[in-house]
């Protein structure tokens, strides 16, 4: 982890906010918002259709753009109104998305993400990662069940921004597509996340992950919307751009961990 002085860190967030990130096409950002809002639909047909659309869309120049990172428009309030936790809002959210790839199949990614602690997989980031499943942990990796959900309490090391605590609800779901089994991830903050320095607070954050077969490996799509404040004011734009950098590193770290441990 790279440590910066507070002034340098605030400048970096400001610079990231100024750096242009291409806007996602409407059909792409609408697909991500749909997947988040309808994640728990009983009938998976439209979810499957949306995954297959994204699979077909992510080729050529569109794939290259998504692998660099795209800005996405806000979630509708209807997507968050029924979520557990505090009174969720979508006002002022900044959204970004990134496409990454893994050389491992979806079943191995699901195993890593649900059966092992992120504090073990990413020890340079997580000081604490306490996860408790309400259902599905013992069967989701083998697809003996198609749904798992639970809660996470984490403390992350953000360098000069201090230790950042977060409480999340997490959900995982398998769906079967024409190309094979895909899995979806959804999480959101159940209360404001806070840091120990520079007045950092994340009022709301929502995440959608879409993972589907790509040859012998997996194509992964990440999308997130958040609001963040610091002593300098609204830091949402800079924070959302930092997510792109983080996701790229996390994807590499996850593959490296799987290679060494599974």
Please place each PLM-identified region on the residue numbering.
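Eukaryotic helix-grip
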Residues: 21-262
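Bacterial N-terminal signal peptides that target proteins for export
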Residues: 1-7
């Amino acid at each position: 982890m790279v440590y910066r002085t507070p002034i340098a860190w605030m400048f970096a967030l400001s610079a990231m906010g100024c750096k242009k990130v291409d806007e996602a096409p409407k059909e792409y950002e609408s697909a991500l918002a749909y997947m988040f809002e309808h994640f728990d639909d009983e009938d998976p047909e439209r979810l499957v259709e949306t995954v297959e659309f994204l699979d077909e869309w992510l080729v050529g120049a569109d794939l290259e753009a998504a692998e660099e990172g795209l800005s996405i428009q806000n979630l509708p309030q209807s997507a968050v109104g029924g979520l557990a936790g505090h009174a969720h809002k979508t006002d002022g959210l900044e959204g970004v998305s990134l496409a990454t790839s893994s050389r491992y199949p979806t079943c191995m990614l699901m195993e890593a993400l649900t059966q092992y602690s992120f504090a073990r997989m990413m020890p340079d980031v997580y000081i604490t990662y306490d996860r408790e499943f309400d259902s599905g942990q013992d069967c989701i990796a083998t697809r003996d069940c198609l749904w798992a959900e639970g809660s996470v309490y984490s403390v992350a090391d953000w360098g000069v921004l201090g230790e950042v605590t977060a409480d999340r609800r997490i959900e995982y779901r398998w769906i079967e597509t024409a190309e094979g089994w895909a899995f979806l991830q959804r999480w959101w903050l159940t209360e404001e996340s806070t840091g120990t320095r520079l007045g950092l607070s994340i009022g709301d954050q929502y995440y959608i992950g879409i993972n589907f077969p790509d040859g012998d490996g997996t194509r992964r799509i990440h999308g997130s919307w958040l609001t963040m404040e610091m002593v300098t004011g609204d830091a949402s734009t800079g924070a959302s751009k930092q997510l792109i950098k983080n996701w790229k590193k996390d994807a590499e770290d996850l593959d490296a961990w799987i290679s060494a441990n599974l």
